């Protein structure tokens, strides 16, 4: 079953090579015996690092990418962060190391999991998860088995028909929400419009993973139980960063934030378990009545997942919520900011969308969305300019040479490619300009590619068997939302966007999302 995903990754790699035509360079081959020893990798001492994270320390309230940049200035393109309790972390900002890391990740690429999440699943709620780790936090053969099982469900294009209708319905509700809350004079959204975008994303994910309509964009917007879920998802992002990315003091000291995070994870787990339990009951009733759809003829993604077992369905739903809610908010917000400040790009996108949506209320279908190259280029450029995090992590299964140093097996290695692609001119010319054309298959765009870029720098959904399992769902969600918004409204924003987001480990909104949505004529 993994062959489908490998083929998809080959296609992605070919597209990236097209973007970086001829510019990729092989990492310099250095014999392990000739490499400088691991102990010589520069970096702060354990005591220096602890002090830096304490109140008054240099890194106490510093965004992660700025911390990495400070260490980059002090120690060079590769440096080591010693662990307070656990595994060291080696950070490299040398693009020539990235291929070495990905090509040596092994059969079951190991990514350091969130230890608080491991504790929650293996200790706090052991009776629910029963040894299941999931796609985002799991590793090893158990992860590989689950990934192989769900790949055909989540990644096959033909399964998009199972959730297309739900996503279109949610998008239409979002348009109506905009018309209700915008100022009738200025056409602006209220200061807290980011909350509505977050609700759009959560509603969309639940419509796919749980086959459930929450009503977040309408009648159930202020429902206490649903708001509890929304707040719990925010806690997971904020508290997970504080407790897991920073030194893990929670292992040794009673910390209120740790208890709060456990309560928030309980809320999300119970919510998913309840709705999946209802779905399983419906499936059992259909089976007794003889009306259960045959395998391959299911009418929802949840129905397919539920054929495995309750734990699998719960874990996939939770993973989609954890990995999709805030990141997709940032991505969609970033694309809207970019389009609002680039009226020429917005006009070109509108022209393309009019080709499939001649009227504002024309229907979106799988068929008419197949050929939208400029829309997809806008999404890629938005993801490049507004990445959700600095990069990714891998644990090396055997010794490798990175930047001339021997990195020993079992070491966690991080890369900062996302930050580099968003901010560094040597990798992307006109780096802070929104230029979707750089992603089109046009030989005249070669000047929009940095001379030192490599094919392994733009991988926002990951690489290989560990690439994001929810990529197709997120792509479709964005394509539907942006198509409907641009077709119905002229999008504007009358304020600076230089500091639109703030970065901790994941990025969060930093300014009021006071977009203008001006109704278009037919």
From Swiss-Prot:
Annotated compartments: Mitochondrion membrane
Annotated heme binding sites: 468
GO cellular component terms attached to this protein's record: mitochondrial membrane
EC number of the protein: 1.14.-.-
Cross-referenced InterPro entries: CYP11_CYP27_families, Cyt_P450, Cyt_P450_CS, Cyt_P450_E_grp-I, Cyt_P450_sf
Keyword terms, alphabetized: Heme, Iron, Membrane, Metal-binding, Mitochondrion, Monooxygenase, Oxidoreductase, Transit peptide
Alphabetized GO MF terms: heme binding; iron ion binding; monooxygenase activity; oxidoreductase activity, acting on paired donors, with incorporation or reduction of molecular oxygen
Pfam family, any one: p450
Cofactor(s) it depends on: heme
Keyword 4Fe-4S on entry: no
Family annotation (PROSITE patterns): CYTOCHROME_P450
Domain of life: Eukaryota
Coiled coil: none
Xref: PANTHER family: CYTOCHROME P450
Similarity comment text for this entry: Belongs to the cytochrome P450 family.
Protein name: Probable cytochrome P450 12e1, mitochondrial
